[in-house]
Amino acid sequence: MDTSRLTLDHFLSRFQLLRPQMTHKTLNQRQAAVLIPVVRRPQPGLLLTQRAIHLRKHAGQVAFPGGAVDSTDASLIAAALREAQEEVAIPPQAVEVIGVLPPVDSVTGFQVTPVVGIIPPNLPWRASEDEVSAVFEMPLAQALQLGRYHPLDVYRRGNSHRVWLSWYEHYFVWGMTANILRELALQIGVKP
């Protein structure tokens, strides 16, 4: 699919018809979830955050709203929606959940489930200063271009680990966020 013609309807039909394949068995047991907020527009957007610089883990990194499942969450989807409300003030009832992607292991020991949801374009996003330093929207067509992701093999605790890297404007997108976006691009089948 040509990215210049990526409408929300095209994205939805391809997302629903082309189900993701499990690429590997996850090893981590602690559960977390992130929301992949697709902004409902004729040319859809993707809402991303930049984590606050003072955080202990992943400080300053571009990320999806999300976090660990807690005892009040009825499901992984509920956890993603709760975290999105806490981090960027997206009301759970404003999200039209369209599905989930296969879980991904994080280097911090979590099994992270990406939840894909459609959000209205007129939401007054507000970053929680405790967790988020910036909220920005990237065109979905750009996020789903496979050619924008570049591999880097790193070694951590004696093991080789492939990390994906990309840029959008002045934001450096890498690690789990870039990996999730790349997997979504592979599923949707968008060509540069």
Curated annotation (Swiss-Prot):
<dbReference type="GO" id="GO:0010945">
    <property type="term" value="F:coenzyme A diphosphatase activity"/>
</dbReference>
<dbReference type="GO" id="GO:0009132">
    <property type="term" value="P:nucleoside diphosphate metabolic process"/>
</dbReference>
<feature type="short sequence motif" description="Nudix box">
    <location>
        <begin position="67"/>
        <end position="89"/>
    </location>
</feature>
<comment type="similarity">
    <text>Belongs to the Nudix hydrolase family. PCD1 subfamily.</text>
</comment>
<dbReference type="Pfam" id="PF00293">
    <property type="entry name" value="NUDIX"/>
</dbReference>
<dbReference type="InterPro" id="IPR045121">
    <property type="entry name" value="CoAse"/>
</dbReference>
<keyword id="KW-0479">Metal-binding</keyword>
<keyword id="KW-0464">Manganese</keyword>
<keyword id="KW-0460">Magnesium</keyword>
<keyword id="KW-0378">Hydrolase</keyword>
<dbReference type="InterPro" id="IPR023735">
    <property type="entry name" value="Nudix_NudL"/>
</dbReference>
<dbReference type="InterPro" id="IPR000086">
    <property type="entry name" value="NUDIX_hydrolase_dom"/>
</dbReference>
<dbReference type="InterPro" id="IPR000059">
    <property type="entry name" value="NUDIX_hydrolase_NudL_CS"/>
</dbReference>
<dbReference type="GO" id="GO:0000287">
    <property type="term" value="F:magnesium ion binding"/>
</dbReference>
<dbReference type="GO" id="GO:0030145">
    <property type="term" value="F:manganese ion binding"/>
</dbReference>
<feature type="domain" description="Nudix hydrolase">
    <location>
        <begin position="29"/>
        <end position="160"/>
    </location>
</feature>
<dbReference type="InterPro" id="IPR015797">
    <property type="entry name" value="NUDIX_hydrolase-like_dom_sf"/>
</dbReference>
<protein>
    <recommendedName>
        <fullName>Uncharacterized Nudix hydrolase NudL</fullName>
        <ecNumber>3.6.1.-</ecNumber>
    </recommendedName>
</protein>
<feature type="binding site">
    <location>
        <position position="87"/>
    </location>
    <ligand>
        <name>Mg(2+)</name>
    </ligand>
</feature>
<feature type="binding site">
    <location>
        <position position="83"/>
    </location>
    <ligand>
        <name>Mg(2+)</name>
    </ligand>
</feature>
<comment type="function">
    <text>Probably mediates the hydrolysis of some nucleoside diphosphate derivatives.</text>
</comment>
